[in-house]
Amino acid sequence: MSGITRHSQPSLRAGVRLQHDRARDQWVLLAPERVVELDDIALVVAQRYDGTRSLAQIAQELAAEFDADAAQIEADVIELTDTLHQKRLLRL
């Protein structure tokens, strides 16, 4: 993992934006010269990357919203965040 913890407060890097792609009818992260398609779960997490909320806070919000296990959601949020960070789409 690349130093991501439950206390990390990620945001989209400059030049990366969350956008609905009408041609694909799918939400994507649009970055210079590439597009990353998001599934429904990745979308609800990515919508919360604002640079102010920690991953623990995001996980707690999602656990409450979806009535799910907070520990499992936190692990999944950290894993997704690590993947997107490795693709250079996020800053911490």
UniProtKB/Swiss-Prot annotation:
Protein's UniProt keywords contain RNA-binding: no
One GO BP: pyrroloquinoline quinone biosynthetic process
Q: Which InterPro entries match?
A: PQQD, PqqD_bac, PqqD_sf
Q: Does the keyword Cytoplasm apply?
A: no
Can you name one GO molecular function term for this protein? quinone binding
Q: Which pathway does UniProt place it in?
A: Cofactor biosynthesis; pyrroloquinoline quinone biosynthesis
Report keywords, A-Z.
PQQ biosynthesis
Spell out the Pfam families in the cross-references: PqqD
What job does this protein perform? Functions as a PqqA binding protein and presents PqqA to PqqE, in the pyrroloquinoline quinone (PQQ) biosynthetic pathway.
NCBIfam families attached here? PQQ_PqqD (TIGR03859)
Describe its assembly.
Answer: Monomer. Interacts with PqqE.
Q: Which protein family is it in?
A: Belongs to the PqqD family.
Q: What is this protein called?
A: PqqA binding protein
